[in-house]
Amino acid sequence: MMMLITMKSTVLLSVFTVLATWAGLLEAHPLGDTSDASKLSSDYSLPDLINARKVPNNWQTGEQASLEEGRIVLTSKQNSKGSLWLKQGFDLKDSFTMEWTFRSVGYSGQTDGGISFWFVQDSNVPRDKQLYNGPVNYDGLQLLVDNNGPLGPTLRGQLNDGQKPVDKTKIYDQSFASCLMGYQDSSVPSTIRVTYDLEDDNLLKVQVDNKVCFQTRKVRFPSGSYRIGVTAQNGAVNNNAESFEIFKMQFFNGVIEDSLIPNVNAMGQPKLITKYIDQQTGKEKLIEKTAFDADKDKITNYELYKKLDRVEGKILANDINALETKLNDVIKVQQELLSFMTTITKQLSSKPPANNEKGTSTDDAIAEDKENFKDFLSINQKLEKVLVEQEKYREATKRHGQDGPQVDEIARKLMIWLLPLIFIMLVMAYYTFRIRQEIIKTKLL
């Protein structure tokens, strides 16, 4: 009897054990599971480093990097470098999420060193190690964390297509996005999460401790094999011993729940304060802008001159063509006037004294003079016609809203030039006839 009870108890215990095991499995991996745990890829992630005795076989360390007390120390001493690369490439299809947990201890302040996280084409690694101990010529994404830029400690995103190497001296000007990030000499590690979703209109989002650093939909990674890694160097400034340490790295085949956290508390951005002083009242006004908005307000003298040239061109575009035609007409009339005046001067100076022996009558002489100088006498009529046409043109231009202060000014100057010429012509014509009359009287006498 006791044996039967013992056997029943053993069977029941086994049944309960199996049920409990299945319940645990179902809870951890339910049917059709879409949780973050099901998306975690152990082949592309770091295992628990606390219990690890050596660097996993699917990862490769370089330079001074080493596993120490549950973390991988990339830079363990002054002027040191370190790297950690995944040996196998990741075949990108549509989306992924990767998280790096790291910290920096041992130094705080400006330094020419930094730590870079890489997601680059497989063919670009590890050809060179000139950019923060990483490739200077790569095709993919680089996330740089350093404290050598103009805005202090920042996280910056860099993109390159592998066509030309990245210039380290211009890396801050070529960043497509960035955010402030206080990371130095902190006992609390920071987590950088990179999410890319091809199906969500090429969404690329970078988060720091669940806060959005930046995001964009203007970046698209082509399909292919990519290498994942991290490199660091602590630089030579002040011979610092800044230690960059990796605690955790997880890679997910898809977008996880934490990637969808709304940006309620945005990360801090640098602020620039500009003081404006009113010259008339002397009042001061402070305007606060982000560094990126302030850069948009800057304009060089060359750009200012180009803008002024465009404005001047638009002002003159409405009337310059018609005005040029009128000016050409005026110049033509002036040339004809000078030609006639030259002819008159020559005739008056070269004509011999007349006598009455030829039997020329006074009426015939006057008629002959009028015939010789009919072109000269018609100049006044032509000038009057030009002035009338110019006045009509000005009135028509005013009606069409095309006339401006410049046309009036030019017309006024032309009148100043033409009126003295007309007066001179009339005076010369008067004295010419007087001389002619005196000559006729002399003949009669």
Curated annotation (Swiss-Prot):
Keywords: Disulfide bond, Endoplasmic reticulum, Golgi apparatus, Lectin, Membrane, Signal, Transmembrane, Transmembrane helix. Disulfide bonds join 179-213. GO terms for molecular function: carbohydrate derivative binding; D-mannose binding. GO terms for biological process: endoplasmic reticulum to Golgi vesicle-mediated transport. The chain crosses the membrane at residues 413-433. Residues 36-254 form the L-type lectin-like domain. It is found in: Golgi apparatus membrane; Endoplasmic reticulum membrane. It is a single-pass type I membrane protein. InterPro entries: ConA-like_dom_sf, Emp46/Emp47, EMP46/EMP47_N, Intracellular_Lectin-GPT, Lectin_leg. SUPFAM superfamilies: Concanavalin A-like lectins/glucanases. Residues 1-28 form the signal peptide. It comes from the Eukaryota. Pfam families: Lectin_leg-like (PF03388). A motif (Di-lysine motif) lies at residues 441-445. Residues 430-433 are annotated as: Mediates the interactions with COPI and COPII coat complexes. The di-lysine motif confers endoplasmic reticulum localization for type I membrane proteins. Belongs to the EMP46/EMP47 family. Homooligomers. Interacts with EMP46 in the endoplasmic reticulum membrane. Interacts with the coatomer proteins COP1, SEC21 and SEC23. Involved in the secretion of glycoproteins and in nucleus architecture and gene silencing. Required for the endoplasmic reticulum exit of EMP46. This is Protein EMP47. The gene is EMP47.
